[in-house]
Amino acid sequence: MKKVVTRFAPSPTGQLHIGGARTALFSWLLARHFDGIFHLRIEDTDLERSKQEYTDTILESMSWLGLNWDGEIVYQSKRNERYHEVIDILLQTGHAYWCHCSIEQIEKMREEARQKGEKPRYNGCCREKKLSANPSGVVRLKVPSAGQVTFNDLVKGQVTVQNTELDDMVLQRSDGTPTYQLAVVVDDHDMQVTHIIRGDDHVSNTPKQILIYNALGWEIPIFGHIPMILGSDRQKLSKRHGARAVIEYQEDGFLPEAMLNYLVRLGWSYGDQEIFTLQELISFFDGTNLHSAPAAFNIEKLLWLNAHYLRRLPVSQIANLMLPFVRKEGFTHITKERIEAVLPLYVERADTLKELVYLMKPVLISASDLTYKEDDIKKIVTNESKEHLDRLRNLLEAEINFEPLYIEQLIHEYITSNNLKFKEIGPILRLAVSGVLGGPSLQELIVVIGKKEVLARLDKLRFQL
């Protein structure tokens, strides 16, 4: 069996988004399943819109997702000589020709076709003239006037397009640059690509590219056109649906394992299984079971998956992943050990690393930086609150065994001996030590913050009341 070779070919005119990442993942999995080769090609022929910064973020996003590529990255901008070589072959073999028609002439042809109720197109007036090269001319493919193009798509099944529906497409522009249709065929052939997975917005390109393959006598790869990803309202996916660049998900504290698991289910299934290890994905993904209906992006499902993966990680690993986020918040003095001590209180409450840092922030900051919202104070403070805080402070200061069990007992005894209910002191004590009204177990929170810091926080709120 011929070795399976796939590729991902983004254009560096923007960042890598969800749709592109899914295409890359499907192509990567197919290659890895068959122990094949996965290539990365940067289609940077649009010199005006292509930017190095976009190339950098695409590569960073791919690396973060773990979609490693084989061999050197191919840059289209460095392959012009090869494209011109192939164009010369097509001209010499009679499969392409020079066209000297002006833009105005071509627009007139199209308008005449529209008036006749026909598809607007170039009418092939230069097709048989055997014109020579012209600085203002273009090179066109001589599309067979009869027949059809048929290919079996991994997603859509058999697709057939009549040649009469196709134009004599431009292969080389008047400025001498090759068009996308020509460049992509040459690249895929030279890279020995056997399977091309891409968005179904490319379906109309495929018959044109197959005609170029046929003209050159090259083997045609297998195509799979996956449907676009829609928003939850079944409209075109956009930022308002929660979809952003892959790099932004990384910055928001999502895990690559969760992203991969989520992306693969947007257009592929394996029975009813929802959660996969990477090895399972490689084992199961063979190019079948690709969905023909568009998938809907659901940020809540992604958050749920991320929380699942986050909570399965060892505390030490989560702490390592959190360090950059903690540093970004300005906590340069916080150690990994400190993060590990606080983590167990909050990991079940957070969906992402960024949210985890946000929840832990009241514990990580010092008493001097802790603030209390006036609305929270008004909501829970009574005439007796300050007195309760004074007494509890003294009890906590005197407590030798600063452990959750003893702190819980201390609070319980205070409530019982003063004929109180927990709601009369619990919220004010929590607000004093953490700055917020909600959170984990109060006694565990107090212990994790530490006696010295807890006393300082109690003093701070007491003086504010």
Curated annotation (Swiss-Prot):
| GO process annotations (BP) | glutamyl-tRNA aminoacylation
Question: Where is this protein found?
Answer: Cytoplasm
Amino acids binding Zn(2+): C99, C101, C126, E128
User: What are its E.C. numbers?
Assistant: 6.1.1.17
Q: Which SUPFAM superfamilies match?
A: An anticodon-binding domain of class I aminoacyl-tRNA synthetases, Nucleotidylyl transferase
Required co-factor? Zn(2+)
Pfam families registered for this protein in UniProt: Anticodon_2, tRNA-synt_1c
Q: Where is this motif: 'HIGH' region?
A: 10-20
Q: Which reaction does it catalyse?
A: tRNA(Glu) + L-glutamate + ATP = L-glutamyl-tRNA(Glu) + AMP + diphosphate
Q: Which GO terms describe its cellular component?
A: cytosol
Q: Does the keyword Nucleotide-binding apply?
A: yes
Tell me the HAMAP family matching this sequence: Glu_tRNA_synth_type1
What is the name of this protein?
Answer: Glutamate--tRNA ligase
Native source organism of the sequence: Lawsonia intracellularis (strain PHE/MN1-00)
Q: What is the lineage of its organism?
A: Bacteria, Pseudomonadati, Thermodesulfobacteriota, Desulfovibrionia, Desulfovibrionales
